[in-house]
Structure formats: structure tokens, C-alpha cells
Regions:
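Active-site-proximal alpha-helical scaffold in enzymes
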Residues: 1-4, 79-86, 151, 173-194, ...
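Active-site pocket-lining segment
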Residues: 12-15, 100-169
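Hydrophobic alpha-helical scaffolding
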Residues: 35, 39, 109-113, 172-175
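N-terminal extracellular/periplasmic Venus flytrap/periplasmic-binding protein-like
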Residues: 1-85, 90, 153, 158-160
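Short acidic, glycine/serine/threonine-rich loops at helix termini
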Residues: 22-25, 93, 110-112, 173, ...
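Condensing-enzyme catalytic core mediating Claisen C-C bond formation in acyl metabolism
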Residues: 44-114, 118, 122-125, 183-184, ...
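Cysteine-centered functional microenvironments
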Residues: 61-71, 102-103, 135-142, 161-177, ...
Length: 216
């Protein structure tokens, strides 16, 4: 995916100040330019992931959730600009995509994580679309098990889901994920000359959200 995220990341400089442990009277200043997601790890291998132990177990059943198939702790920020047709005209802006529909729905809190199963059909109905018309699906994967459940229950085309990787590979900065996933979707569809895409994610306590976008 070299260069795939270039258009959606705005590099910025971070200035950090730390005491010099060898000389307590000095403060060291370091300048770092953040221009890549912190999540991807080039040294990750299938063999290494297979060695990780499950975090949860239920009686005699072996667990499936490991540090390797769960989203990591991430720092991040994201922003999108949502404008009306009149605002686009007034300020001379060229839109990248059209926000077609949005829905929020919920499932029982004890099965939190599969909220998108309830939200996706509502968003598609509002947009007047079917799943077959979606070219790209950004499904936030807090855990691989959660994503697989949504793909299975909704009958999503796995080949269209997270084609550039999801939160497990890239990170899941809470509060920024919606904007980040939307940026990936919109820029990706425009590069590939695709038309319709969806961003969906689970939210704590059983909620789920889904949004449909049309690339312009």
C-alpha cells in the first residue's frame, strides 16, 4: 500500500522536551515529523502472530482474541469538512464525495461489537442502494472476531472490506476513527474511479453506525 495514504495524511511537527538524565540541569528538545500511521509493523509475520496466546477463555473453549488480531492503542486525530451545496457555491469549494445516508442502531450490550449488523441495512435502505452496489467498505475492526461476525451476518463481500487494512493493522484512535476511515474510503474510491462506499463501526454499549458515501 505504498503511497496509498499520502493524500489523506497531513504531516505535522511534534516538539518534545525531556530532561537530560545524564545532566539534570539540561532539557533536551527533539523535533519529530509525524507523516505515517504508527500502527504498521514491517516485522510482523504469520508465524509470529500464531504464537500469541489468547487473552480470553471460556471454560473448556479456547480463546481466539490475541494481541495480534485486536486493534492496538493508538494516538491520532482526523478531520473532515461537511458542507451544504450552498456553502460549496459560496466559498468556491470542490467536493470530494457526497454524504448519502447515515444510520445508528443497537444490539444487546452483552454482544457489543456487532452493532453494524443493525445499522448497515438501515443506511442502505435510506440511500436506496443494495450491498452489491457498494465498491468499498471500511469496517472498523476493533477485533478480528467482531469484524468476521459482521461480515458473516450481513453477507458482506470480504474482498471489498478494508482493502488497505483496518484498525488491527493501522490503529484505532478512539474519536478519530470515523474521520480517518472516511478519508481512506473517499480517497481510495476516487483513485480507483469507484462510486459508492460505506463506513461502519461498532460503538460501546451495543451501538453501531453506518454511513454511505458517493465519490465525485
Amino acid at each position: 500500500a505504498a503511497g496509498e495514504f499520502k493524500d489523506e495524511i497531513s504531516p505535522y511537527e511534534i516538539v518534545s522536551h525531556q530532561p537530560d538524565l545524564a545532566d539534570g540541569r539540561r532539557i533536551l528538545t527533539r523535533n519529530t515529523v509525524a507523516e505515517h500511521d504508527e500502527g504498521p509493523r514491517a516485522d510482523t509475520s504469520v508465524e509470529g502472530l500464531a504464537k500469541l496466546r489468547p487473552v480470553f477463555r471460556n471454560g473448556q473453549f479456547g480463546g481466539t482474541v490475541t494481541a495480534g488480531n485486536s486493534s492496538q492503542m493508538s494516538d491520532g486525530a482526523g478531520a473532515v469538512l461537511l458542507a451544504s451545496a450552498q456553502a460549496l457555491k459560496d466559498y468556491g469549494l470542490t467536493p470530494l464525495a457526497r454524504f448519502v445516508s447515515f444510520s445508528v442502531a443497537g444490539v444487546r450490550p452483552e454482544v457489543m461489537g456487532i452493532g453494524p449488523i443493525a445499522a448497515i441495512p438501515k443506511a442502505l435502505k435510506q440511500a436506496g442502494l443494495t450491498q452489491d452496489q457498494l465498491d468499498w467498505i471500511e469496517l472498523n475492526e476493533a477485533f478480528a472476531a467482531q469484524s468476521l461476525a459482521v461480515i458473516h451476518d450481513c453477507g458482506l463481500d470480504a474482498a471489498k472490506v478494508n482493502p488497505l487494512g483496518g484498525a488491527i493493522a493501522l490503529g484505532h484512535p478512539l474519536g478519530a476513527t470515523g474521520a480517518v476511515r472516511t478519508a481512506t474510503l473517499v480517497h481510495g474510491m476516487r483513485r480507483r474511479q469507484q462510486k459508492y462506499g460505506m463506513v461502519t463501526m461498532c460503538i460501546g454499549t451495543g451501538m453501531g453506525a453506518a454511513g454511505i458515501f458517493e465519490a465525485l
